[in-house]
């Protein structure tokens, strides 16, 4: 088995880590940073940019720069109406209600999984270069409160990226692995994970290699992006009040405001006040308009008061489901960049009566935990037992539109449970199984995971046929459902017809497209490398000719000068075959030149050092000692 990496696929930033010498280590990306922005962009020429380079050009290319895509993965448009307002790119909906990201540069629409796959591919490519071997397997983290569709979509993203996803692991659980790896004493910990797009709380028992999740709760519509948006909306109002200009439809201005708001939020974690200066934000017939505003930490907390208060409910629910009060929590572990907000830290301290433990890096701890789980699966890490739970109840729709729960939330996984149902009318030939996820009493208020039919039920009075419905959740938290007629033995597994995950043939198409684009990317990169190498060779050759002026004959000098000119022409004309050929010939000619110069110099030195007059006579001398 090759190296298995752990990946924290984040809303704002992503991190990759690996076990090295029995210890988890974060892998730097090609740019030398430990975190990679979860941003993908397409230029006017169709080039794909991923990470920091994509984020840097977002202001001048807002329509083709995709960020915070994790908020859309595995979801329908009606589930993310607020999130859709926060991005500068165009989001569309297909005939099934699934989200598509419009890319004007390529005249193409992307699924969220495809964009996430590009981020994963970048992380894996950088890890492969670092490790010196191709990485094909990974453990990927997801928010604990992700539903089945979102988990399956994340797994699909891994597959599109060319990865075998060995395990989907919950982010708070991964953080607990990193925190408790060397802990021998038993502790009850609460992991408070506020990231860029989601919020999770998990209560765990940790100690001596056993990590048992007691409960989990969360809010997948709450994260750092929402805090940024509060500042953005405030700035929009301030600007409109001052200049009577509404910037809400100006995508470039919105992108600049979003970046400035994120920067201000980060600065206010350490400063009591910061400045937001955006010159030339827009222009009218009267001239350019600038934005200059000061924002205090108190003002920021006032703007975000409703968001800050929203974190209370999941914390209370997690404690309630774990049947614990705050006094039983030994440590509170903060995870996610948004936990650096002082008001969040104060709230945690107030509701749990405990100072949060800040010994772990909130940006890296999830990836480190994923690497530990990867090490367990690869056999590198021993004596660790991880017992996770399903975050939401699972059930089916029964008569009257009611949700009948089969697996309650916070059930330890993997698990398998069955319930027997019957027909509602006489001689009913089939039953439709509508699979649901959520805590509401009625089917219409819960998340629909899909429907399937069991046909061929023998004619019988209602209530007589016995239909056994089995729910099976694997270690990834992904569900499969079967229905079996106990009378005939006929069985049917779920076929998703309405869930917000991609059909298998669509995933297959994306996998093939990704493989082809990876090949094209390599060819394009090889050409760029060849061009740079040739340009560098021309420069070095010209430099060498100047240094050897007077030491080489005109024939060799003219020959190499001619080759340099030919190579420069090939570079300018982008003739890569000729470039490759001339590159090789010029290198050989330079080697021969160097060899001839060395031999010539060596002969001259030998000639100079030879004695001109040999005299072997010995001179006698008398020495006297003076005292």
From Swiss-Prot:
Listed under GO cellular component are: chloroplast
CDD domains reported for this sequence: ASKHA_NBD_HSP70_DnaK-like
Question: What InterPro entries is this protein classified in?
Answer: ATPase_NBD, Chaperone_DnaK, Heat_shock_70_CS, HSP70_C_sf, HSP70_peptide-bd_sf, Hsp_70_fam
Q: Does the keyword Signal apply?
A: no
PROSITE patterns named among the record's database cross-references: HSP70_1, HSP70_2, HSP70_3
Q: Where is this region: Disordered?
A: 597-627
State one molecular function term (GO): unfolded protein binding
Q: Where found?
A: Plastid, Chloroplast
* NCBIfam families according to UniProt: PRK00290.1, PRK05183.1, prok_dnaK
This chain's function reads: Acts as a chaperone.
Q: Member of which family?
A: Belongs to the heat shock protein 70 family.
Q: Which PANTHER family match?
A: HEAT SHOCK PROTEIN 70KDA
Spell out the protein name for this chain.
Chaperone protein dnaK
Q: Whose protein is this, by species?
A: Guillardia theta
